[in-house]
Amino acid sequence: MQKEVVDSMAMKRALTRITYEIIEQNKGIKNVVLVGVKTRGVYIAQRIAAQLQQLEGTAIPVGELDITAFRDDQPLDQARLSTDYQLTFSVADKRVILVDDVLFTGRTIRAALDALMGGGRPQSIALAVLVDRGHRELPIRADFIGRNIPTARQERIKVTVNEIDGHDGIEIIN
């Protein structure tokens, strides 16, 4: 059973709130870069970047991070050990905003941090998520949250984005 809990307008408002919070906490966007976790985190990061550019008049870099080789639920193999740095820009001395769609156990973000560190030492790393659903297994928290949606552990959150799914929204799946 699926139940829509956030429609496209509410999702847009959540992303706008995240955008304003990023500007406020960073006192502007100087030295800020966004890095989206594949797949939906990339599209969310691109939307935030577009709003930041509209509000601040400056384009900021947006990177795409594939964390597959860094997941702790995959066997450690040569492919994982030889993974090259993926971003087209350095994160050294930058304020990195890591962007993902859903924060659940924290394991995806841990893998993203591992993947990110090949690009130099950032000034800081903050986490922006569209949905925080709780149930953390690691000591990871989001700095920017679009919506807190408490769920039962066995439920799933499905974020849909227009670029992939043809519409925006957030659903709980039992």
Curated annotation (Swiss-Prot):
Binding site for substrate: 39-40, 100-108, 133
InterPro entries in the cross-refs: PRibTrfase_dom, PRTase-like, PyrR, PyrR_bifunctional
A GO MF label: RNA binding
Short sequence motif PRPP-binding: positions: 96-108
E.C. number: 2.4.2.9
Keyword Oxidoreductase assigned: no
One Pfam short name: Pribosyltran
EC top class named in words: transferase
Chemical reaction(s) catalysed: UMP + diphosphate = 5-phospho-alpha-D-ribose 1-diphosphate + uracil
Keywords, ordered alphabetically: Glycosyltransferase, RNA-binding, Transcription, Transcription regulation, Transcription termination, Transferase
One GO BP annotation of this record: DNA-templated transcription termination
Coiled-coil ranges from the UniProt annotation: none
Free-text function comment from the UniProt entry: Regulates transcriptional attenuation of the pyrimidine nucleotide (pyr) operon by binding in a uridine-dependent manner to specific sites on pyr mRNA. This disrupts an antiterminator hairpin in the RNA and favors formation of a downstream transcription terminator, leading to a reduced expression of downstream genes. Also displays a weak uracil phosphoribosyltransferase activity which is not physiologically significant.
HAMAP family assigned: PyrR
UniProt record similarity statement: Belongs to the purine/pyrimidine phosphoribosyltransferase family. PyrR subfamily.
Entry-linked PANTHER family: BIFUNCTIONAL PROTEIN PYRR
Assembly with partners or alone: Homodimer and homohexamer; in equilibrium.
Name used for this protein in its record: Bifunctional protein PyrR 2
